[in-house]
């Protein structure tokens, strides 16, 4: 029988306190209201979601995994349902800039939530990071047409980002990787 997952909320909050993150971040105008009053309930809600929704489906990710058929990737239905709840709850965009529809919280806050999500279910927890990378690339380097087309769906969690490694001869060319 598996041991029930218990999110490390107290440890994460302790980490924020030890590095004095509230006072450090309060010096930045965008985070002047950042406090324990925001962090504690955020971590508690993330823990509740992770303990109740993500941890119970962790084994399914290992046992069933993702499949690809005719160019379409399919996840276990439990992962699809969990991701919908994740996106609807705003976890997908908690630290994204508010001017593109995100929560505008400091990335240190999403660091704590990502730790909770990932320790409950690593296969699930990896997805938000890939989306954040795609969102950042488009937001900082995309033209307005690309931003208008992709950012709303990525920020809302309707779409997810992917990892694309394709630089030939520069260390991330997956086609040339071999194993022993």
Residue ranges and their predicted role:
Residues 1-126, 145, 149:
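Amphipathic, small/basic residue-rich leader segments at the start of a protein or domain
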Residues 19, 141, 166-168:
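Structured loops at beta-to-helix junctions and adjacent beta-edge loops in soluble globular domains
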Residues 95, 103, 145-180:
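Glycine-rich, Trp-frequent "lid" loop and neighboring beta-strands that shape
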Residues 99, 130, 167:
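Residue-level "edge-of-site" marker
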Residues 107-108, 141-142, 176:
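Short glycine/threonine-rich loop-to-helix capping motif typified by GTGT followed
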Residues 126-144, 171:
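N-terminal glycine-rich flavin-associated loop
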